[in-house]
């Protein structure tokens, strides 16, 4: 596959999400228990970038990640980040990304749906309820993510 074969074929209509957004907060709600938790710590880092050409890049990294020295530590690093990219489209209050590269191979080839709203220079995002590969033991969860326009 060449880079040109994964590029969006046409520009997305101008929208309020286009541009670069910096992570402000990331939390998760657990459907079964009502629990909320911050799986990436109180100060995770990340960005989401929406291009006019219809590409999205999403990266979220846990607070305090350190270089790994063992195979087990390298394995643990997989659950302390989320990263994916692909072409996106907007449908009402949803953005839908057709994932072509991801930190977790099970996402490649899928469509990831996110609900969003823009309030001033903030992008507030939530996921549908789903089992997240980073913490499957929690069952159905929903992520709530807040970004600030850069």
What residue spans do the PLM features occupy?
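Lipid interaction determinants
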Residues: 2-83, 90-150
């Amino acid at each position: 596959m060449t880079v040109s074969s994964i590029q969006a074929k046409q520009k997305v209509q101008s929208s309020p999400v286009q541009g670069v957004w910096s992570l402000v907060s990331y939390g998760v709600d657990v459907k079964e228990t009502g629990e909320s938790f911050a799986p990436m710590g109180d100060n995770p880092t990340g960005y989401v970038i929406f291009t006019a050409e219809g590409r999205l890049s999403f990266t979220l990294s846990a607070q305090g990640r350190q270089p790994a020295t063992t195979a087990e530590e390298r394995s643990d690093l997989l659950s302390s980040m989320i990263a994916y990219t692909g072409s996106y489209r907007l449908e009402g209050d949803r953005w839908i990304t057709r994932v072509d590269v991801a930190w977790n191979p099970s996402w490649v080839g899928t469509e990831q749906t996110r609900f969003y709203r823009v309030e001033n220079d903030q992008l507030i995002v939530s996921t549908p309820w789903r089992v997240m590969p980073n913490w499957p033991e929690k069952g159905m969860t929903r992520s709530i993510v807040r970004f600030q326009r850069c």
